[in-house]
C-alpha cells in the first residue's frame, strides 16, 4: 500500500532522498526549501491563511524579516495537485510545509481521502485536527467539479 508522509520543513531537511517518492513542497512565498537529490519535487508557495477574501489585502512578515502581501492557496494550485495525483497513482508521497501542522496536513489528508493511501504524520503533527480549511475546501471543490 502506498503511503503519504506529512512533515515539517525541519523533518523534510532530515529525510534522505528516496527514488520514486513524490515530494509536494509547500513553503511561504519566496522561501523554498532546497531539495537536491529528490526525483520529483512539486513546489507550491502560499501563506498559511484560512479565508482568501479576508487576507488578500493584508501584509505578512516573512521568515527573513521582510514584509509581503499575503498569498493564499488558489483554485489553480488545487488543479495542479489533482493533476499530480492523477499522474502518480501508485507512488509514495511526502508532503511538507514549514510547521507540518496546517498546509501540509490538509494536502496529506486529502491525498489519503482521495487515493486511499495511508497517511502518516510525523514531527509536530499528531493528527489532522489543524488542517488548513481553505486548502481542503478548494481541493474538495476540484473533486466536485470533476464529478
Where are these regions (language model features)?
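Short glycine/proline-enriched coil/turn segments at helix->beta-strand junctions
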Residues: 18-20, 37-40, 89-91, 112-117
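Cysteine-dependent PTP/DSP-like catalytic domain, specifically the C-terminal lobe
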Residues: 109, 115-147
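Adenosine ribonucleotide-centric catalytic and binding domains
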Residues: 38-50, 126, 130-136
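A structural signal for short, well-ordered beta-strand segments and their strand-loop junctions
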Residues: 25, 94-96, 121
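Glycine-rich, flexible N-terminal cofactor/catalytic loop recognition
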Residues: 1-47
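Helix-loop module immediately N-terminal to the HCX5R catalytic loop
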Residues: 42, 46-94
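Alpha-helix C-terminal capping segments
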Residues: 13-18, 84-88, 111-112, 139
